[in-house]
Amino acid sequence: MIKMNIPVIFQFLKDLSANNNREWFNEHKAEYETARAEFDNFLATVIARISLFDETIRGIQPKDCTYRIYRDTRFSADKTPYKIHFGGYINAKGKKSDHCGYYVHLQPDGSMLAGGSLCLPSNILKAVRQSIYDNIEEFVAIVEDPEFKKYFPVIGEDFLKTAPKGFPKDFKYIDYLKCKEYVCFYNVPDDFFAQPDMLEQIDKVFRQFKRFADFINYTIDDFE
């Protein structure tokens, strides 16, 4: 197993959360750079593992997946200047693509392995819903498989209150069409990253997610 210093990442993020101001950050820039380098190392390892079963992401580098630590506070009541997590969005089409991708989020008491498509344009969202409706048996075989539900018991995070326009209200699986985004989240505790088989567990989670992503991306491929 490749050695990765995850505790260094968590310790910096804990300290940053308690001291989220520019003066403290500037005084601890070296610690930030060390923690960021450790996260990039971790992310590179995860990318390499995923690429063994998803060849589309081979060659992707951490810099292609990560985000600036500076928050955009222009339209937020929270004016703290820095994010208190590190995140990496692994997507063969790029971070801004509508395609489903894999997401790794490290945050003390808030880490997750996730993925999906957020903020889809209305025409693509409608097409995805239509694809689910037309191929519901295939979709249900994925998302209601016990192995999938072990990690992702819920599809989506924000939902319509009623059936989307153009679909029958009495459709048995209408809840799957009410999703405003097609995403999955698997929350993990901090000690998950200290387990000796951590990378093998990440493999299992993202192998299951890939089945969902492949279904959604089949439709999105027509638009990108």
Residue ranges, per PLM feature:
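Extended, charge-rich alpha-helical segments
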Residues: 43, 47-94, 110
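Short His/Asp/Glu-rich catalytic/ion-coordination signatures at enzyme active sites or charged loops
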Residues: 5-34, 184-198
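Charge-rich, low-complexity terminal tails
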Residues: 171-224
